[in-house]
C-alpha cells in the first residue's frame, strides 16, 4: 500500500488493544511543527503477512526512517485522517509510545542516538525535535557524550534558569514536571539534579532475574575433559569478549557452552542460557531464545507481545545456541533492543553475547528474506572462532572423512552405496529419520498399533492457577457505579506517587500490576511485584531492610494499606479489602483463555496425551541425570507405582521427592519403567513446565506435569539436530525436499558408520549454501592461541569494569 502525502504531513502509526482485539489507526500530524525543513513525500510500506512496517519521510537528506515493528495490519482496520497535534502530544509524548514499544531501528546509530534520548523523569524515548526535549535543553540538560541515550545535567547553567522559565513546570498538571521544578529550585540544585538523574536511570534499568533465566550447572561437566581449542575459547570468554563459536557436528559446542556458563556464574555473573530450538534448549538446560527475551513471533495475528526489557537488564551474558536459525534482521533487532533496554550505546547494550552454531547445518527456512545471521551488522561485534577437534567421531575414522566431504557438498557414491543395506538385529533398536514430519508421525503410529500389549495413556496434569513471582497482597479498590472509572495509566501514576510519598521509593511501572476484578464492573486488584531480597514496602527514605527482618510483616502491611487507601482516596474510589490470595472469581476469564492459547501454540506436544504400550520404543527428551539424557532411547518394560529408587538421579544424593501435587491428586498412579540401550533401568517421573506467568496473564500461570518421553521410532531431521543418537539409525531420503545441509545433519547424528543406514539418496540432494561455506572457511581456528587475539576496536562487556580483578587472560 502506498500513500501519497502533502508536503506538510507525516504519518504515524499507533495501535491500541482491548482484551483480545486490536485496531490500528494512522494519524497525520502537521509536519512543520516536527521538522525544520519541508518533506517532499511520505510513503507507508506494509506487508500483507508478517513483514515490518516502515514509515519513510523523504527529503533531500532523507531525514528519518523509523521502523514500527513486525506487526500485521488488517486492511479493514486502517483509517487515515489528518488532525492537528494536541498539547498532550508534546507534553507527554503519548502518541510516540510506539517508538519505545517497538524499538527504533533501520537508520545509522549516530543519527538515531542524536535524534532520541530516554527522558529520565518518564522513562520514555523522547525525540530531540519535540517540545519536551527543547524545554529540557533550555533548563540545562544535554546529551551525554559517553551515552547519547541519556541526558546529563550541566551545573554551569543552573544560574541561568529563571523563575519565569520554571513557572510552566510548577503549574503543570504533569507530576514529573512539578517534581523537576521543585528540584531545580533547591539551593543545592547543582549537585542534587545530577544525583537525581543518576538515580532515576538506575531505577529505569533495574531488573530482577526471572525464573526462566535461572539455569543449573550440568553435574556431568566435572567428569569431562576440555579439548585445547575448547580451553582457548573459555579463556577468551572469561575476558568479556562477545564471540561466535562455530564447528562441525560433534565438536563439543554444547558442552563448551555449559562449561562457559559454569565459569561465568562462578564469577557471580548472571547468564541467560538460550537456544533457538526447544531440543537445543533442553540440551543446554536453559530455555528458548524467544521465551527468554519475549521475541514477537512473526505471522501471529493480533499479537500483543513485546521484547522483554527486564530480561535484557537482568543478565550480564547471553548464550545463544543454534544461532544459525536466526536471520540477520532478527539478530540486528536483538542488538538494538538490548541497547535500548539497557540504555547503553555500546554493542548489545554492554551485554556479552556468546553465539554458537554451524551455518553448514540446518538454518532458517527462507534465508532470502532477511539473510543469514552472519550478514548482519551486529554480528561484526562477535569474535568468530571455530572448534576443530571432533568429540563424536574418532580422528582419522573413514566416517569422519565422509562427513567432512558431505559438509562441503561432495558426494561419495561408493560410500553411500555401502550404506544402503538391510536392517539387521533387533528392530526395536532402530531409529528412522525422515525429511518430513508426517512420515515420522505415521511410522510412530504404525509401530505402536502393531503391539498387542497393555496400553496406557498419560494425559498432562495441570496444576492450580498461581502467581509466578513475588508479590504484595492484592488490594481491592472499587468505584461502585460511578462513570468516571480511572484508566490503568492514571491508577499507576497515582499509586507510584503515593509509594514515593509514604516509603520514599520510586517504583518502575512494570512492577505495578492492575488487574480487573473478575465480575466486578468498576473494581480492580492492585499489587506490586518485587524481588525475593527486596520489598519496597518496608523501605523509607531510600533505605531498605532484608526481607524477613523482625516486625517486618507489620510494617509492610501497614505501609501497603496506607498506600492503597491514599491511592483510592485520590481516585475517588474505596479500598474494600486486602487479599493474601485472590478469590478465584476475581481472576478475569481472559487469563484462562490466554493460558489456553499459550499452551496450544508453543507447547502443543506437551499437552497432547502420550500413548505408550509395553514393549514400545521411546526416546527421553530431557536431561535427567549423568546417564539419562535428551536422546537416550529404550524399551518400556512395565507400568508400576512411583518408586523413588528407580528415578534418575541428577546428583549422588537421594533423588528429589516426587511432585507432591501429583501424588495428592493421583494424576500419575502408575509410571513407565524403561530399559535403556545401555542396560540401565529407570522409571520416568513427570516433570513440571510453567505455562504463563507473563504480563499478558497478569503474572498468573500454572504448572503442566508431563512425562519426559516420546515415541522413539521416527523423527524428522530438524528434530534431531544437536542430538547424538544411539543404536541403528536409518535415513530414508525418498521424499526429500530441497534443503541445504539436510543429508549432512542427518548422517552426523551417530558416532560410527556401523550405526548408519542411508536409502534413496542422490548426488543432487547434497546441497550446500555457498555463502555459508565461505563464512565457515573464514573462521579462526580455536586451537591456535594467537587466532583468539581480539581485532582492533573490539569492545568487552560492561561487567568487565566491575570484575576486572577476576578476569583470566589468554596467557594465564
From Swiss-Prot:
Gene Ontology BP term (one): DNA recombination
InterPro entries: AAA+_ATPase, DNA_helicase_pif1-like_DEAD, P-loop_NTPase, PIF1_helicase
Alphabetical keyword list: ATP-binding, Cytoplasm, DNA damage, DNA recombination, DNA repair, DNA-binding, Helicase, Hydrolase, Isomerase, Nucleotide-binding
Localization per Swiss-Prot or TrEMBL: Cytoplasm
Cofactor requirement: Mg(2+)
The keyword Transmembrane helix is annotated on this UniProt entry: no
Gene Ontology MF annotations: 5'-3' DNA helicase activity; ATP binding; ATP hydrolysis activity; DNA binding; magnesium ion binding
Broad enzyme group: isomerase
A Gene Ontology term for the protein's cellular component: nuclear lumen
Complex and partners: Monomer.
Family the UniProt entry places it in: Belongs to the helicase family. PIF1 subfamily.
Name of the protein in question: ATP-dependent DNA helicase PIF3
Organism of provenance: Trypanosoma brucei brucei (strain 927/4 GUTat10.1)
Classification lineage: Eukaryota, Discoba, Euglenozoa, Kinetoplastea, Metakinetoplastina
Gene: PIF3
Amino acid at each position: 500500500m502506498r500513500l501519497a502525502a502533502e508536503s506538510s504531513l507525516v504519518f504515524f502509526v499507533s495501535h491500541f488493544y482491548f482484551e483480545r482485539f486490536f485496531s490500528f489507526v494512522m494519524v497525520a500530524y502537521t509536519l512543520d511543527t516536527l521538522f525544520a525543513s519541508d518533506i517532499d513525500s511520505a510513503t507507508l510500506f506494509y506487508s500483507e503477512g508478517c513483514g515490518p512496517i516502515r514509515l519513510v519521510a523523504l527529503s533531500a537528506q532523507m531525514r528519518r526512517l523509523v521502523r514500527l515493528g513486525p506487526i500485521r495490519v488488517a486492511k479493514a482496520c486502517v483509517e487515515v485522517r489528518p488532525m492537528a497535534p494536541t498539547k498532550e502530544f508534546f507534553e507527554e509524548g503519548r502518541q510516540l509510545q510506539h517508538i519505545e514499544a517497538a524499538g527504533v531501528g533501520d537508520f545509522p546509530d549516530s543519527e538515531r542516538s542524536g535524534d532520541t534520548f530516554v527522558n529520565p523523569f518518564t522513562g520514555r524515548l523522547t525525540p530531540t525535535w519535540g517540545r519536551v526535549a527543547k524545554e529540557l535543553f533550555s533548563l540545562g540538560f544535554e546529551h551525554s557524550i559517553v551515552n547519547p541515550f541519556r541526558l546529563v545535567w550541566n551545573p554551569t547553567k543552573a544560574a541561568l534558569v529563571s523563575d519565569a522559565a520554571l513557572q510552566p513546570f510548577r503549574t503543570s498538571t504533569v507530576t514529573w514536571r512539578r517534581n523537576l521544578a521543585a528540584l531545580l529550585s533547591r539551593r543545592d540544585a547543582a549537585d542534587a539534579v545530577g544525583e537525581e538523574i543518576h538515580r532515576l536511570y538506575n531505577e529505569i534499568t533495574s531488573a530482577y532475574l526471572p525464573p526462566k533465566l535461572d539455569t543449573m550447572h550440568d553435574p556431568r561437566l566435572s567428569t569431562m575433559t576440555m579439548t585445547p581449542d575448547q580451553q582457548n575459547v573459555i579463556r577468551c570468554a572469561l575476558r568479556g569478549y562477545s564471540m561466535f563459536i562455530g564447528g562441525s557436528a560433534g565438536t563439543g559446542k554444547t558442552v563448551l557452552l555449559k562449561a562457559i556458563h559454569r565459569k561465568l556464574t562462578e564469577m557471580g555473573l548472571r547468564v541467560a542460557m538460550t537456544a533457538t530450538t526447544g531440543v537445543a534448549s533442553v540440551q543446554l538446560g536453559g530455555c528458548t531464545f524467544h521465551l527468554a527475551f519475549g521475541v514477537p513471533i512473526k505471522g501471529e495475528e493480533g499479537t500483543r507481545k513485546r521484547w522483554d526489557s527486564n530480561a535484557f537488564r537482568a543478565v550480564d551474558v547471553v548464550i545463544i545456541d543454534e544461532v544459525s536459525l536466526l536471520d540477520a534482521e532478527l539478530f540486528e533487532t536483538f542488538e538494538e533492543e538490548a541497547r535500548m533496554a539497557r540504555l547503553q550505546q555500546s554493542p548489545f547494550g554492554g551485554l556479552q553475547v556468546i553465539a554458537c552454531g554451524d551455518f553448514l547445518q540446518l538454518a532458517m527456512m527462507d534465508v532470502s528474506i532477511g539473510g543469514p545471521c552472519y550478514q548482519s551488522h551486529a554480528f561484526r561485534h562477535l569474535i568468530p572462532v571455530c572448534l576443530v577437534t571432533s568429540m563424536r567421531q574418532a580422528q582419522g575414522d573413514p566416517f569422519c572423512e565422509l562427513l567432512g566431504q558431505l559438509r562441503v557438498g561432495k558426494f561419495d557414491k561408493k560410500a553411500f552405496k555401502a550404506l544402503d543395506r538391510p536392517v539387521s538385529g533387533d528392530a526395536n533398536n532402530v531409529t528412522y529419520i525422515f525429511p518430513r514430519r508426517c512420515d515420522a508421525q505415521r511410522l510412530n503410529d504404525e509401530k505402536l498399533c502393531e503391539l498387542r500389549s497393555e496400553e496406557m495413556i498419560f494425559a498432562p496434569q495441570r496444576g492450580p492457577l498461581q502467581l509466578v513471582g513475588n508479590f504484595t497482597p492484592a488490594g481491592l479498590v472499587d468505584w461502585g457505579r460511578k462513570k468516571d472509572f480511572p484508566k490503568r495509566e492514571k491508577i499507576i501514576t497515582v499509586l507510584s506517587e503515593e509509594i514515593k510519598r509514604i516509603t520514599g521509593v520510586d517504583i518502575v511501572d512494570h512492577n505495578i500490576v492492575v488487574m480487573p476484578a473478575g465480575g466486578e464492573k468498576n473494581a480492580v486488584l492492585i499489587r506490586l511485584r518485587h524481588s525475593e531480597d527486596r520489598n519496597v514496602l518496608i523501605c523509607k527514605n531510600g533505605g531498605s531492610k532484608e526481607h524477613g527482618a523482625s516486625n517486618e510483616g507489620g510494617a509492610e502491611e501497614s505501609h501497603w494499606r496506607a498506600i492503597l487507601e491514599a491511592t483510592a482516596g485520590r481516585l475517588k474510589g474505596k479500598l474494600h479489602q486486602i487479599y493474601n490470595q485472590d478469590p478465584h472469581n476475581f481472576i478475569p476469564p481472559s487469563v484462562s483463555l490466554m493460558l489456553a492459547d499459550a499452551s496450544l501454540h508453543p507447547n502443543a506436544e506437551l499437552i497432547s496425551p502420550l500413548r505408550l504400550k509395553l514393549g514400545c520404543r521411546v526416546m527421553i527428551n530431557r536431561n535427567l541425570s549423568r546417564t539419562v539424557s535428551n536422546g537416550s532411547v529404550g524399551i518400556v518394560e512395565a507400568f508400576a507405582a512411583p518408586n523413588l529408587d528407580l528415578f534418575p538421579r541428577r546428583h549422588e544424593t537421594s533423588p528429589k521427592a516426587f511432585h507432591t501435587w501429583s501424588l495428592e491428586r493421583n494424576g500419575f498412579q502408575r509410571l513407565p519403567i524403561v530399559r535403556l540401550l545401555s542396560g540401565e533401568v529407570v522409571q520416568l517421573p513427570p516433570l513440571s513446565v510453567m505455562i504463563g506467568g507473563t504480563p499478558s496473564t497478569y503474572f498468573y500461570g500454572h504448572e503442566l506435569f508431563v512425562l519426559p518421553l516420546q515415541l522413539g521410532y521416527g523423527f524428522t531431521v530438524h528434530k534431531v539436530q544437536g542430538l547424538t543418537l544411539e543404536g541403528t539409525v536409518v535415513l530414508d531420503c525418498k521424499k526429500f525436499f530441497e534443503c541445504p545441509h539436510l543429508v549432512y545433519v542427518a548422517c552426523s547424528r551417530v558416532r560410527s558408520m556401523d550405526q548408519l543406514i542411508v536409502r534413496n539418496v542422490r548426488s543432487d540432494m547434497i546441497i550446500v549454501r555457498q555463502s555459508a561455506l565461505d563464512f565457515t572457511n573464514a573462521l579462526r581456528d580455536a586451537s591456535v592461541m594467537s587466532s583468539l587475539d581480539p581485532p582492533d576496536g573490539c569492545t568487552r562487556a560492561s561487567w568487565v569494569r566491575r570484575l576486572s580483578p577476576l578476569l583470566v587472560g589468554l596467557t594465564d
